[in-house]
Every structure is written in structure tokens, then in C-alpha cells.
């Protein structure tokens, strides 16, 4: 097949390829509108006509006042009739789908809000606040839990055996403590605490008896002076000195006589 490399053949081939086929998909807005010169209400940013008799108008180029404003030129009603209400189509449709997904078949309004609240309460039940009560400050202390440890009530048999063991040994080993606890049907901790308290009591009793003994001895000694007292020896020595001063010794009298004779 001979090929032609002339300019005319190449131009005609390119023009034939540029023609759109008959089965091409329709444009984005396949609505017939008047020619561009008849649209006086469109903004300057409106899209230009790509084909004869068709106009692709971008929704962003047409303002809301031009679509929903007062009637103006005769071309504006034609434009509104040609295009669907894209504002409601693109804005309210997703919201409608959301409401239908949440509560299908329920109308909007106070009834819908009440139905939604009832549905929420059934899905997430809340406890009744009347079930809970608060304890006032003035209430008795018996209602509050006590933080003190419960005292162990020992029987007379247990106390007798514990006292007997304490008299023989004040300090127990762990094995002996376990034996006593098993024999008296007590826990090891109870036996340990009892012996600790008993040792403290024993020390207090010993200190009290020592104080009483020391006080009684001091009170008894105040009646009569003990033997070897310094005050008694001093008093006897003073009495002997007084007795010696009363008679005159012969040695002293002779000395005085000699002194009298010597003097002229």
C-alpha cells in the first residue's frame, strides 16, 4: 500500500483523529443551555463552551446569589431549569445518608431526639442514683469501717497454758511457738503477740515493785538513826569537851603559880 508523505495528507489524517467518536461518554454536565452570549448573569470565571450548543459551567464559578437570588434576565430561569439544585445535592445528601444509617425510618425533630435518647439508654444502661447513699458527717461512727485490729479473746484454758509456759520460758523459739499454737488451737502470730505483751507487762510490774521497796526503806529509816552515824559521834565528842572544861587540871594550876612567883 503506497504511503503519501504530503502535507495535505498528514493534516487531513490529524483532523480525522481529533474528531470524537460517536460512542464517547457524555460530558460531566450533559445539559443543553443557551449560547454564552445569552447568559448575562454568569460571572467572568464561567467555563467557555467546548462544543456547539453545550456549556460546561463549574459550580464554583456560579455564586449562590445568582442561582437563588431575585428573578433577573430571562436567561437566569433557563439556567436554573437546566441545572439541578447542586447545593442540596452535594451538601444535604451525605447528611441524609448519615441520619438514615443511624436511625433509619425515624423523622427529624423532637420525636427523633427522644427516640435517640431512649435508644442510647437501652444500649448503655446507667445505674439508678437512688441506689447509692452518702454517709453524712454527723452519722454515728458505727457505720464507718473500723481500722483497728480485732482483739483475740483467749479462753481460760489457753490463758492458763500460756502463763505456765511464760513462767518457764519468757522467750520462745519458733518450733516451740508452733507447738503451742497447734496445741491451743491458735495461730503462730497470736502466740507471738501474746508473749510480747506479757513481757512488757512483766517489765512494768518489776519496775513498780522496785520503786515501792525503795520508798518504804527510806520512810522506816527516819525514826531512829542507824549505827555509826556521824551526828551521834559528834554530839558525844562535844559533850566530853564540855565536861573537861569544868575541872581545872593540876598542871595548869602549877604553871599559873610559877608565873605568879616570878613576877615582882
Swiss-Prot record:
Residues 211-225 have a biased composition (Gly residues). Residues 201-264 are annotated as: Disordered. Residues 1-20 are annotated as: SNAG domain. Residues 254-264 have a biased composition (Basic and acidic residues). One of its GO terms (molecular function) is DNA-binding transcription activator activity, RNA polymerase II-specific. Belongs to the Antp homeobox family. It comes from Homo sapiens. The lineage of its organism: Eukaryota, Metazoa, Chordata, Craniata, Vertebrata. GO terms for cellular component: chromatin; nucleus. Disulfide bonds: none annotated. PROSITE patterns: HOMEOBOX_1 (PS00027), HOMEOBOX_2 (PS50071). This is GS homeobox 1. The keyword Transcription regulation applies. Residues 229-238 have a biased composition (Low complexity). InterPro entries: GSH1/2 (IPR042191), HD (IPR001356), HD_metazoa (IPR020479), Homeobox_CS (IPR017970), Homeodomain-like_sf (IPR009057).
Amino acid at each position: 500500500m503506497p504511503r503519501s508523505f504530503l502535507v495535505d495528507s498528514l493534516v487531513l489524517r490529524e483532523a480525522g483523529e481529533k474528531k470524537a467518536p460517536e460512542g464517547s461518554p457524555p460530558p460531566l454536565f450533559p445539559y443543553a443551555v443557551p449560547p454564552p452570549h445569552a447568559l448575562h448573569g454568569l460571572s467572568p470565571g464561567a467555563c467557555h463552551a467546548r462544543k456547539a450548543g453545550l456549556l460546561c459551567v463549574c459550580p464554583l464559578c456560579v455564586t449562590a446569589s445568582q442561582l437563588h437570588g431575585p428573578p433577573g434576565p430571562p436567561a437566569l430561569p433557563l439556567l436554573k431549569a437546566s441545572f439541578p439544585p447542586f447545593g442540596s445535592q452535594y451538601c444535604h445528601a451525605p447528611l441524609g445518608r448519615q441520619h438514615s444509617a443511624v436511625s433509619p425510618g425515624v423523622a427529624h425533630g423532637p420525636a427523633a431526639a427522644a427516640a435517640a435518647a431512649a435508644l442510647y439508654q437501652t444500649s448503655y444502661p446507667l445505674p439508678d442514683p437512688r441506689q447509692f447513699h452518702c454517709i453524712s458527717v454527723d452519722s454515728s461512727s458505727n457505720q464507718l469501717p473500723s481500722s483497728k485490729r480485732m482483739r483475740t479473746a483467749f479462753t481460760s484454758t489457753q490463758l492458763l497454758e500460756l502463763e505456765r509456759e511464760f513462767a518457764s520460758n519468757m522467750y520462745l523459739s519458733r518450733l516451740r511457738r508452733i507447738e503451742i499454737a497447734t496445741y491451743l488451737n491458735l495461730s503462730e502470730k497470736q502466740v507471738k503477740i501474746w508473749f510480747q505483751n506479757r513481757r512488757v507487762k512483766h517489765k512494768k510490774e518489776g519496775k513498780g515493785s522496785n520503786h515501792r521497796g525503795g520508798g518504804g526503806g527510806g520512810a522506816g529509816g527516819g525514826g531512829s538513826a542507824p549505827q555509826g552515824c556521824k551526828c551521834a559521834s559528834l554530839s558525844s565528842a562535844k559533850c566530853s569537851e564540855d565536861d573537861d572544861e569544868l575541872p581545872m587540871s593540876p598542871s595548869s594550876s602549877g604553871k599559873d603559880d610559877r608565873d605568879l612567883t616570878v613576877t615582882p
